[in-house]
Amino acid sequence: MGQKVTGGIKTVDMRDPTYRPLKQELQGLDYCKPTRLDLLLDMPPVSYDVQLLHSWNNNDRSLNVFVKEDDKLIFHRHPVAQSTDAIRGKVGYTRGLHVWQITWAMRQRGTHAVVGVATADAPLHSVGYTTLVGNNHESWGWDLGRNRLYHDGKNQPSKTYPAFLEPDETFIVPDSFLVALDMDDGTLSFIVDGQYMGVAFRGLKGKKLYPVVSAVWGHCEIRMRYLNGLDPEPLPLMDLCRRSVRLALGKERLGAIPALPLPASLKAYLLYQ
């Protein structure tokens, strides 16, 4: 689970009021997942073939990284000194809600580990060690080690994320977490251990944005697994009803759906079959 570090380590649960922001201006922030995002996360993940379609682009990368032949969801960075290297995903998104999982071992992050989105024009290489994703107006990035958000970083100040952190606190981002890009609302958010961290960036609507990361650690390997997407159309009533039933049952009782006194077709629908 994501953790805050001050003098010691504290587990963060945003549902616990003791971890709500102390700053008055942050207390109104919503840490509940939006309805569409909640529905998407309840859906089964897409097939491996679809994941490959949304994976790292071996033709759109720094020359110091490459997509692995034996697992095309992972890219590897060569141990090149004084270099920051990035790679984009294959698909640029202009509409809909999209969620992907990033798996990046904490021990392989080094001084500048940044995850976010970028246009096709964002640079993918820089000399020296830097926060490459978010350094200009073509990309938006979350620096995992610094807990800072960067966009047009050469001209704009960074912001704390998650926003509930106090100045003396650090949020430890685990090896795996989720990225949620909503091109209909124009927002980028992150989810850690099932907890919605709030909106990181706004104003993305009307752009074409690709998943991106920038790294400095030699031999680091970063996996991106596309989970699913939702079109911008209104959510069907049947889907909303299914979600309500599954919520009422709770995750621990979903396995009991086949035993419910319901028609077989309805039980199959509740199980996404």
Curated annotation (Swiss-Prot):
Task: Cite a single GO BP annotation.
Answer: ubiquitin-dependent protein catabolic process
A GO cellular component annotation here is: cytosol
The pathway entry for this protein reads as:
Protein modification; protein ubiquitination
Q: Which residues cross the membrane?
A: none
Range of residues in the leader sequence: none
- Please state where this protein is localized: Cytoplasm; Cytoplasm, Cytosol
Please state every residue range assigned to the domain named SOCS box: 232-273
B30.2/SPRY domain boundaries: 33-231
Q: Which InterPro entries match?
A: B30.2/SPRY, B30.2/SPRY_sf, ConA-like_dom_sf, FBXO45-Fsn/SPSB_families, SOCS_box, SPRY_dom
Tell me which UniProt keywords the record has, alphabetically: Cytoplasm, Phosphoprotein, Ubl conjugation pathway
The Phosphotyrosine modification is found at Y31
Q: Name one GO molecular function term.
A: ubiquitin-like ligase-substrate adaptor activity
The similarity comment for this entry is: Belongs to the SPSB family.
Output the PANTHER family linked to this UniProt entry.
Answer: SPRY DOMAIN CONTAINING SOCS BOX PROTEIN (PTHR12245), SPRY DOMAIN-CONTAINING SOCS BOX PROTEIN 1 (PTHR12245:SF8)
Describe its assembly.
Component of the probable ECS(SPSB1) E3 ubiquitin-protein ligase complex which contains CUL5, RNF7/RBX2, Elongin BC complex and SPSB1. Interacts with CUL5, RNF7, ELOB and ELOC. Directly interacts with MET tyrosine kinase domain in the presence and in the absence of HGF, however HGF treatment has a positive effect on this interaction. When phosphorylated, interacts with RASA1 without affecting its stability. Interacts (via B30.2/SPRY domain) with PAWR; this interaction is direct and occurs in association with the Elongin BC complex. Interacts with EPHB2. Interacts with NOS2.
Any idea what job this protein has? Answer: Substrate recognition component of a SCF-like ECS (Elongin BC-CUL2/5-SOCS-box protein) E3 ubiquitin-protein ligase complex which mediates the ubiquitination and subsequent proteasomal degradation of target proteins. Negatively regulates nitric oxide (NO) production and limits cellular toxicity in activated macrophages by mediating the ubiquitination and proteasomal degradation of NOS2. Acts as a bridge which links the NOS2 with the ECS E3 ubiquitin ligase complex components ELOC and CUL5.
What does the UniProt entry state concerning the protein's domains?
Answer: The SOCS box domain mediates the interaction with the Elongin BC complex, an adapter module in different E3 ubiquitin ligase complexes. Essential for its ability to link NOS2 and the ECS E3 ubiquitin ligase complex components ELOC and CUL5. The B30.2/SPRY domain is involved in MET and PAWR binding.
Q: What is this protein called?
A: SPRY domain-containing SOCS box protein 1
